[in-house]
């Protein structure tokens, strides 16, 4: 489970406690977010991505990215309309449109292609899915860096997506939850960096991973003013926003030095290195991700072809025989079959322990005798 074990920055927790002691904050807040927080989001986007946002009409606070995304689908889609969702995917991306009565067309991700080839094939499949669906889809849902596959894309990729969306009158919703958990020489862009993107796109940004504030339920939807105002109107009937002290603490987080975020990402980078290199040493070759807090691993062929295991059976095997919990790929859709997802939410000693457990479990099955 992608539930960070790293605590939030101490100064953010201190601010929460300080404000929570004040009597006047214990009441309903604003569903759209207090003005200072929306301004802090706009300033953060300017510094981080070079994107200009109007705090009044292009920024809204959401009670976590899942809530924001789900209600955005409710604000955008009606029965009989269709969303395109790449798969495998974070489950709510696929099911929120269905919950609101819309249809979903899956776009299988070409997971094993390198970035340039991935971009070309993704766009080819997007064109194919869009044009083979009648009436044409209304929304494209994307998320890069991607959960669970850890796929990353360039700004050029977003340019092509926006170009396609404008040409075909398609809305784009981009979940940018892992924008700040990146490694090596890669820096994830925002889709709103594309000129004219706000004409067709909304982006979700969360503090859960960037500031290790999972459970605080603080996220934002930013971008197209029509969609943001529709979401504001909908949420005004549904909720009273996030507890005010949490909003004030979020302001402090967003206004802090970016090194705070990078220090959190460096912890995940070290864990990534230990896990991927450890798996490689025991004969399980896994691609090293450039972003997210996950490792997406293809199950060795010995287990799928010789032992006949699917991803759920293999996950149970690792749990019972190695004492290691992973997410079966099928849990992210049928296109995730044959893969498992590791979450980098344990320290380096625990990761080393996990590698030893997996090696022992592999040995019991005859994996190494078979040349694994």
Predicted feature residues:
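Conserved PLP-anchoring active-site segment centered on the Schiff-base-forming lysine
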Residues: 75-97, 124, 128
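Conserved glycine-rich beta-strand-loop-beta hairpin in the small C-terminal domain of fold type I
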Residues: 251, 266-276, 286-300, 336
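Active-site phosphate-binding strand-loop segment of PLP-dependent enzymes
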Residues: 109-184
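PLP-dependent enzyme catalytic core of the Aspartate aminotransferase-like
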Residues: 127-128, 305-309, 317-326, 331-372
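Helix C-cap/helix->beta junction micro-motif
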Residues: 100, 167-168, 282, 322
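N-terminal small-domain helix-loop-helix segment of the aminotransferase-like
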Residues: 1-64, 71, 125, 253-256, ...
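Conserved core segment of the aminotransferase class I/II
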Residues: 193-194, 198-269, 273-282, 361-362
């Amino acid at each position: 489970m992608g539930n960070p074990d790293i605590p939030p920055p101490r100064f953010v927790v201190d601010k929460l406690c300080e404000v929570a002691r004040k009597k006047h904050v214990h009441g309903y807040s604003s569903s759209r977010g207090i003005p200072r927080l929306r301004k802090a989001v706009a300033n953060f986007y300017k510094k981080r991505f070079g994107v200009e946002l109007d705090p009044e009409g292009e920024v809204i606070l959401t009670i976590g990215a899942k809530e924001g995304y789900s209600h955005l689908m409710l604000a955008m889609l009606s029965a009989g309309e269709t969303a395109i969702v790449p798969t495998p995917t974070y489950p709510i991306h696929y099911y929120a449109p269905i919950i609101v009565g819309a249809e979903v067309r899956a776009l299988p991700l070409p997971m094993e292609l390198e970035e340039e080839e991935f971009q070309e094939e993704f766009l080819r499949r997007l064109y194919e899915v869009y044009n083979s669906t009648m009436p044409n889809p209304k929304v494209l849902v994307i998320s890069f860096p991607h959960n669970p596959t850890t796929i990353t894309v360039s700004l050029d990729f977003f340019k092509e997506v926006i170009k396609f969306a404008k040409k075909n009158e398609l809305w784009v919703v981009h979940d940018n939850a892992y924008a700040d958990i990146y490694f090596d020489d890669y820096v994830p862009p925002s889709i709103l960096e594309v000129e004219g993107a706000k004409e067709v796109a909304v982006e979700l940004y969360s503090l859960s991973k960037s500031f290790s504030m999972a459970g605080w339920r603080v996220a934002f939807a930013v971008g197209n003013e029509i969609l943001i105002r529709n979401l504001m109107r909908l949420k005004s009937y549904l909720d009273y926003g996030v507890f005010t002290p949490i909003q004030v603490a979020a302001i402090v987080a967003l206004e802090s030095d970016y090194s705070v975020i990078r220090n959190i990402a460096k912890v995940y980078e070290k864990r990534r290195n230990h896990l991927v290199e450890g798996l490689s040493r025991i004969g399980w070759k896994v691609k090293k991700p450039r972003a997210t807090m996950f490792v997406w691993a293809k199950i060795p062929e010995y287990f799928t072809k010789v032992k006949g295991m699917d991803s759920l059976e293999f996950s149970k095997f690792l749990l019972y025989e190695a004492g290691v919990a992973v997410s079966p790929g099928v849990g992210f859709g049928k296109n995730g079959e044959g893969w498992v997802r590791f979450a980098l939410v344990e320290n380096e000693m625990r990761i080393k322990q996990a590698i030893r457990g997996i090696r022992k479990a592999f040995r019991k099955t005859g994996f190494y005798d078979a040349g694994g």
